Structure formats: C-alpha cells, structure tokens
Amino acid sequence: MAAKDVKFGNEARIKMLRGVNVLADAVKVTLGPKGRNVVLDKSFGAPSITKDGVSVAREIELEDKFENMGAQMVKEVASKANDAAGDGTTTATLLAQSIVNEGLKAVAAGMNPMDLKRGIDKAVISAVEELKHLSVPCSDSKAITQVGTISANADEKVGSLIAEAMEKVGNDGVITVEEGTGLQDELEVVKGMQFDRGYLSPYFINKPETGIVELENPYILMADKKISNVREMLPILESVAKSGKPLLIISEDLEGEALATLVVNSMRGIVKVAAVKAPGFGDRRKAMLQDISILTGGSVISEELAMELEKSTLEDLGQAKRVVISKDTTTIIGGVGEKHSIQSRISQIRQEIQEATSDYDKEKLNERLAKLSGGVAVLKVGAATEVEMKEKKARVEDALHATRAAVEEGVVAGGGVALVRVAGKIADLRGQNEDQNVGIRVALRAMEAPLRQIVSNSGEEPSVVTNNVKDGKGNYGYNAATDKYGDMIDFGILDPTKVTRSALQYAASVAGLMITTECMVTDLPKEDKSSDSSSSPAGGMGGMGGMM
C-alpha cells in the first residue's frame, strides 16, 4: 500500500479552498448574457470553445492533489445539477463557491462547523419552499420560447425551434439534437410510431419513384414468432383479400416459402402486402410489439398466450390510417387503438422509467413513451465550422433540458432575481444558536452570488446593481443584455424553478461537507528511482579516483 500524505485543520481547508476557487473562477466567467467563452485544449484536433459550465468543469484537473480534491468536489455539484435538471451548472458552482468561502471564514473565526452546516441547511430548506411559492406554470409557447432563448445564451432562433418542437410532439415527446449539414437550424418531425426496421423484400415497394412502401388504411398482423410455413398464414390472408384492404405483417422473422408467397401475391395484386421484422430484441421486442398492438387496437399473436396464427381472425389485427416503410424504417401513422388503453400504457411506461436504474434502460423507455404519445422531433443544428457546431449543439441541448424542467415545475424570474427575492423573504430566519445564525447568513449571502456575477460579467458594478434590485419588489430586476431595470417576466428572462432549486440544493449539500472537513488524505507522489540509480556509478568512480 502506497504511503499517504495527510493534512489537518486549517492547512487542509486552505488547500481545498484554492482548488474550489480555481474551478469556480473558470466556470463563472460563462454566466449571463454577456458571459465569456472558455477555450478547452484537446489532445487531438482543434480546441473546443464553450459557454457551458459543466463542459468547463469536466476538463479541470489540478496538479496539487489536495487542491484537486477541492476542485473535484465542486465538479460533483455541477454534474449533479446537470443530471437533475440538465442546466444550472454554472449557478450551482457559483453558489457552492460562495458558501465554501464564507463558511470557511466563519470556521477560521472559531465557529462550530456542524452548527454552520445546520444553519445553511435550514436556510436552503426554507428557500426551496419560497421558490415553490414564487413559481408560475410554464405551459404556453411564448414562455417556453423565452426559457429556451435564455438557456441558449439569448439565441432566439433556438428558443422558438424548441417551442415549435414541443408544440408538435407534446411535452412528453422525444426531441433529439443532431448535427445538421447546412448553415441553418432545422426542425424535422416524425409523426406516429417509427421504428428501425425496413421492408424484408424490395418487391413490396409500390412507390418506385421514392423507393418506399405506402399502405393506406391497412390491417396490421403482429406475431411474436418466426413465420416460415405459408399454411399458417392462408386463413388470415384470405380474410384480408376479401376485405380489399392492404396488410402489414410485423413478426420476429419471415422466411422461406412464406416470404415468397407474400411477394408473389403482392406482385400479382391479389393482396397488397408488406412485411417487416419486429423492432428490438428479447424482452424489449415483446414490449414494443405490445406497444404497437395497443396503438393499433390489435393483439399480438404469441404462442406464450396459446394463440395460433391459423386461428387468428380480422378482429386480432390492428389498423392504422397509413403505414410508410423505407429500406431502414417503418412509420405507423394514425393507429386506431382506444385512447384510454394508450394512456394506461403510457402511465405504465412512466412508472418503469422511475424504477429503471440504468441510463440505457431509461433512454429506451423514453423512446417508447414518445412513440406512443405523439412522435419524435429532431433538431438539426447548423453552423459554419465544426468548432462552432459542437459549441452550439451543447447550448441547444442545455436549452432543451431547461425547457423540459420549466414545463415540469414552472418558472421564476431569471437573472438571479428569484434567489435575491427568496433571501429577502427568509431574512428573519433564526437557528438554535449564534453559530447556526451565521450559517443562515452565509447561505443568504450566497444567494446573491449569481446576480453579482451576471452583473460583473457585463462590466457593471455588482454591489450597486444588487442593492437596486433588493430595493425593488416582485420580478423587478436587472437585464444585463440591455443594461435596463424592469420586470424580468416582461423582459422574457425566466429560469426554470427546477434548475434554480437543484442548483441551490446540490451546492449547499457539497459545500456543507467541505466546511465540516477536518482532515484530507492523498497518496504521496512517487519518487523517481531512475535518477537515483543513474547517479550511483559516478559516485563509485569518484571513490576509485580517491584511492589512486
């Protein structure tokens, strides 16, 4: 086991504080509409430029191990805030820095660290309750646009694209961000349920000019099995042919004479038919087939449920207004499933998302949720260079997370105003002793830090602006972009309540742990043995010289 370097008390805290300040100072320059860029060196390729707090935090590693521990603990604040709300990483880092700096001053002055932490926690609990009272619902397109615009660093085009995407696919719909091919940002919406499986034979194509299969008002047969024997399918094929409607077959696989028979029937015009493989694998395939059956109002023909393909009737088949099949994808539009069945399935998937432990499972469940609830929107980010593309894509993803958080828990006045108002409302809060009161004051002082930094980044005097904002009421605040005072909601400067709440809670949690730190332990740096061994022969030779 390697030897350890151990530091205690004030010596340990000073080292830790240096690390906290290095990381926080690098992150906080990005805050606000006039925040600056940070250039990150890469081991290969061009440097990347970002205004995203968590991207900056992730890049920072310090040489001194004790200082690095402080930096890594603040990095945890940014990561946790990012995981919880997808935004607010810079605010969280700034709050943590302020609490740690003020808290450690109090510890150095002889205050009890545990009581300080209790005071900070008490202030944060009260502040979160006040934030909930200040919060207003964010449901209309205008408010969503404003939140997206603020989070994308005042890029109105991004804000309006996100609002348009949410309008088209619903608040629960999946919105993905991709790198575009042009200079302009684009929004592409895929309505209905789409999955990554194309036609099993190009002979099914009935739109040769576009190379796709289109079926109008088709029946949909779903089978959780391989189909290779044509006899199994004959009864249902005859029933569909009599109805005059087209047929889509979704099965684990379709091969041999069964596929050949379908192709021949389709080419002769006896029955308009197409076949695709079921999406997913294993249990996920079963679940997705069940989703499709609920969406289309049919049943999955499954041997596990003692259902046989030969005995299936038209009542077992699903229906949709339209199906479009390309080489790689199948899209089912306008399924005729019952609304309440679809809603109960959506509720079930939401429950599974809450219980899921892995990010991969959550991602796949969210995809299924979106396909059932309305569709998928793809935001294609346009830029002139690859460096700009990466920076812009990170901003758009932040803005998307922020708007989702806003829809979930509502919005409060932005620009650091909400925390200043909350601090004003709980200014009379008291703890059980004077040390706890100091902890409360540390937290209240920290709540001004985001506003002060936004003002500082815009080139104005933080104390003057902060006092002016404190003298105002309600949503009255400072618009750093235009250098004007007024109602932040009217200015369109909004912050999601969830983002502000998460930033405050995670900052206080980690900062409280740092204030109560008394000892730090790390590995001693290893000595370079090669330099010692290289010097010994010279010493020996010197000795021989002396003997002569």
From Swiss-Prot:
Binding site for ATP: 30-33, 51, 87-91, 415, 479-481, 495
Predominant localisation class: cytoplasm
Comp. bias intervals (Gly residues): 539-548
Gene: groEL
PANTHER family: 60 KDA HEAT SHOCK PROTEIN, MITOCHONDRIAL
Protein name: Chaperonin GroEL
EC number: 5.6.1.7
Reactions it catalyzes: ATP + H2O + a folded polypeptide = ADP + phosphate + an unfolded polypeptide
Function: Together with its co-chaperonin GroES, plays an essential role in assisting protein folding. The GroEL-GroES system forms a nano-cage that allows encapsulation of the non-native substrate proteins and provides a physical environment optimized to promote and accelerate protein folding.
InterPro entries reported for this sequence: Chaperonin_Cpn60_CS (IPR018370), Cpn60/GroEL (IPR001844), Cpn60/GroEL/TCP-1 (IPR002423), GroEL-like_apical_dom_sf (IPR027409), GROEL-like_equatorial_sf (IPR027413), TCP-1-like_intermed_sf (IPR027410)
